[in-house]
Amino acid sequence: MTSGEVKTSLKNAYSSAKRLSLKMEEEGEEEDYCTPGAFELERLFWKGSPQYTHVNEVWPKLYIGDEATALDRYRLQKAGFTHVLNAAHGRWNVDTGPDYYRDMDIQYHGVEADDLPTFDLSVFFYPAAAFIDRALRDDHSKILVHCVMGRSRSATLVLAYLMIHKDMTLVDAIQQVAKNRCVLPNRGFLKQLRELDKQLVQQRRQAQRQDGEEEDGREL
């Protein structure tokens, strides 16, 4: 073997070792993650921003707001909102709907949910997240996710979106939202978000293992 071939061989070995080290480091961080308990999660919310106005941007072009914001058609139009997700849809909550915005260029999605710990909001996680994701794919879109106060139901659905479509852990999602708006889902919703977090973390770990096995197979 010539000196040039030796150098090339050593370089390839170094590159492979470096890739393996980085992969192990990333997998180690993921493997170390454990979904926190409800009290620990609530502490993350308490450490967040005290800011609580009618509406706040919590992710680029994604806003959490209250009933007053959703009912103010002039303000919505002036602010350039193109989508509204009502997490308190229904006659006894925020009774808007598609007809309320019929003469405006706004797409509407309603979730009929009660802000009760016993209410199963998790059945709406994926449909609501898909609506938000479709809206944000358009660079010209702005979406308002609201309930009555803009603290529990709407925040829960936004957190689920960030976890499902932005590959965030529940901790990451809470930190992202809480630094921009004072929110606090009820204990029941937190429990449902914890279950979603566990499912998504497990899926990501399985995907990483499969990718690692495929990469190892290509290198052999």
Curated annotation (Swiss-Prot):
<dbReference type="InterPro" id="IPR000340">
    <property type="entry name" value="Dual-sp_phosphatase_cat-dom"/>
</dbReference>
<dbReference type="GO" id="GO:0006470">
    <property type="term" value="P:protein dephosphorylation"/>
</dbReference>
<dbReference type="GO" id="GO:0005737">
    <property type="term" value="C:cytoplasm"/>
</dbReference>
<feature type="active site" description="Phosphocysteine intermediate">
    <location>
        <position position="147"/>
    </location>
</feature>
<dbReference type="InterPro" id="IPR016130">
    <property type="entry name" value="Tyr_Pase_AS"/>
</dbReference>
<feature type="domain" description="Tyrosine-protein phosphatase">
    <location>
        <begin position="54"/>
        <end position="202"/>
    </location>
</feature>
<dbReference type="GO" id="GO:0033549">
    <property type="term" value="F:MAP kinase phosphatase activity"/>
</dbReference>
<dbReference type="GO" id="GO:0070373">
    <property type="term" value="P:negative regulation of ERK1 and ERK2 cascade"/>
</dbReference>
<dbReference type="GO" id="GO:0004725">
    <property type="term" value="F:protein tyrosine phosphatase activity"/>
</dbReference>
<keyword id="KW-0963">Cytoplasm</keyword>
<dbReference type="GO" id="GO:0042803">
    <property type="term" value="F:protein homodimerization activity"/>
</dbReference>
<comment type="function">
    <text>Dual specificity phosphatase able to dephosphorylate phosphotyrosine, phosphoserine and phosphothreonine residues within the same substrate, with a preference for phosphotyrosine as a substrate. Involved in the modulation of intracellular signaling cascades. In skeletal muscle regulates systemic glucose homeostasis by activating, AMPK, an energy sensor protein kinase. Affects MAP kinase signaling though modulation of the ERK1/2 cascade in skeletal muscle promoting muscle cell differentiation, development and atrophy.</text>
</comment>
<keyword id="KW-0904">Protein phosphatase</keyword>
<dbReference type="GO" id="GO:0043409">
    <property type="term" value="P:negative regulation of MAPK cascade"/>
</dbReference>
<dbReference type="GO" id="GO:0005634">
    <property type="term" value="C:nucleus"/>
</dbReference>
<dbReference type="InterPro" id="IPR000387">
    <property type="entry name" value="Tyr_Pase_dom"/>
</dbReference>
<dbReference type="GO" id="GO:0042692">
    <property type="term" value="P:muscle cell differentiation"/>
</dbReference>
<keyword id="KW-0539">Nucleus</keyword>
<dbReference type="InterPro" id="IPR029021">
    <property type="entry name" value="Prot-tyrosine_phosphatase-like"/>
</dbReference>
<keyword id="KW-0378">Hydrolase</keyword>
<dbReference type="GO" id="GO:0008138">
    <property type="term" value="F:protein tyrosine/serine/threonine phosphatase activity"/>
</dbReference>
<protein>
    <recommendedName>
        <fullName>Dual specificity phosphatase 29</fullName>
        <ecNumber>3.1.3.16</ecNumber>
        <ecNumber>3.1.3.48</ecNumber>
    </recommendedName>
</protein>
<feature type="binding site">
    <location>
        <begin position="146"/>
        <end position="153"/>
    </location>
    <ligand>
        <name>substrate</name>
    </ligand>
</feature>
<dbReference type="InterPro" id="IPR020405">
    <property type="entry name" value="Atypical_DUSP_subfamA"/>
</dbReference>
<dbReference type="GO" id="GO:0004722">
    <property type="term" value="F:protein serine/threonine phosphatase activity"/>
</dbReference>
<dbReference type="Pfam" id="PF00782">
    <property type="entry name" value="DSPc"/>
</dbReference>
<comment type="subunit">
    <text>Homodimer. Interacts with PRKAA2.</text>
</comment>
<dbReference type="GO" id="GO:0032991">
    <property type="term" value="C:protein-containing complex"/>
</dbReference>
<dbReference type="GO" id="GO:0042593">
    <property type="term" value="P:glucose homeostasis"/>
</dbReference>
<dbReference type="InterPro" id="IPR020422">
    <property type="entry name" value="TYR_PHOSPHATASE_DUAL_dom"/>
</dbReference>
<comment type="similarity">
    <text>Belongs to the protein-tyrosine phosphatase family. Non-receptor class dual specificity subfamily.</text>
</comment>
